[in-house]
Design a protein with these regions (language model features):
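Alpha/beta-hydrolase active-site loop
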Residues: 1-21, 27
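Solvent-exposed, polar/charged alpha-helical surfaces in well-ordered, non-transmembrane soluble domains
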Residues: 7-14, 40, 126, 130
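The feature captures the conserved acid-bearing segment of alpha/beta-hydrolase catalytic domains
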Residues: 52-55, 59-134
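C-terminal catalytic histidine-bearing segment of alpha/beta-hydrolase fold enzymes
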Residues: 126-174
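Phosphate/oxyanion-binding active-site loops and adjacent basic polyanion-contact surfaces
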Residues: 1-9, 121-125, 157-160
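Extracellular/periplasmic catalytic domains that process cell-envelope and extracellular macromolecules
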Residues: 22-23, 47-49, 84-89, 140-141
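Short beta-strand immediately N-terminal to the catalytic nucleophile in serine-hydrolase-like folds
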Residues: 28-31, 57
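Short glycine-enriched nucleophile-adjacent loop
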Residues: 36-47, 164
C-alpha cells in the first residue's frame, strides 16, 4: 500500500482544512455499500487518526479480524495491536437493513470468500459485527461501535442516510 492511498482521506481533509481555514482537527465518514467496504478497511489499515465518527452501512463483504487470508481476513497483514485498539474504539454506527437479504443482488460479491461470510449483505453484516465483538472480548479491547438494524430496509442509500445523520451530527453546535 502506498502512503497516498493508505492515508488518502487524511490528505483530502488536510488540504480542505488548510484551504478554507477550518478550525476542526477531526472529520467523519459515511460509507454505504462499496463505500462501507472502503471505509472499514481505511479505518483498519490507514495511519489516519483524525477520523472521529463513522457510519458503515450495508457493505457487501468485510475484512474479518480472523486468520482467513486477506482480503477476507487478516492473515499475514502487518497490523499492530494498537491499530486494532484504535479501530474498535472509534465511534462507529454500523447499520444494516433486515431486508437487504438478496443473495443474487447484482452488485453483491459472490466469490467463495465472500460467501463464507454469509449468503447476503444482512447475514454478512451480522457475522462481521459478531466477529468484532468476539475479537474485542478475546483480546480485552474496548469496543465502542453501535449496532442498528432497520427492519423494513433493503439496500437503500436514502434510508441509511436518514439514520446516519443524527449520529454524525450528534454533539455538534449547529
Amino acid at each position: 500500500q502506498s502512503n497516498n492511498l493508505k492515508n488518502s482521506l487524511s490528505l483530502f481533509f488536510t488540504y480542505f482544512k488548510n484551504k478554507y481555514n477550518l478550525q476542526t482537527s477531526t472529520y467523519s465518514i459515511f460509507g454505504f455499500s462499496a463505500g462501507s467496504q472502503f471505509a472499514h478497511r481505511y479505518l483498519l489499515f490507514s495511519d489516519d487518526i483524525q477520523v472521529d465518527r463513522v457510519v458503515l452501512g450495508s457493505a457487501g463483504w468485510y475484512t474479518f479480524l480472523n486468520n482467513e487470508p486477506y482480503p477476507y481476513g487478516m492473515r499475514n497483514m502487518p497490523i499492530e495491536r494498537e491499530r486494532y485498539e484504535w479501530y474498535l474504539s472509534r465511534e462507529v454506527l454500523f447499520i444494516l437493513g433486515a431486508k437487504d437479504n438478496d443473495p443474487n443482488h447484482e452488485s453483491l460479491n459472490n466469490s467463495k470468500g465472500a460467501k463464507q461470510q454469509g449468503s447476503n449483505r444482512f447475514e454478512r453484516g451480522q457475522n462481521y459485527f459478531k466477529n468484532l465483538v468476539i475479537f474485542s472480548e478475546e483480546n480485552e479491547i474496548a469496543f465502542r461501535w453501535r449496532y442498528k438494524v432497520i427492519d423494513d430496509l433493503d439496500h437503500s442509500t436514502s434510508a441509511i442516510s436518514e439514520n446516519a445523520f443524527p449520529f454524525l451530527l450528534e454533539g455538534l453546535d449547529y
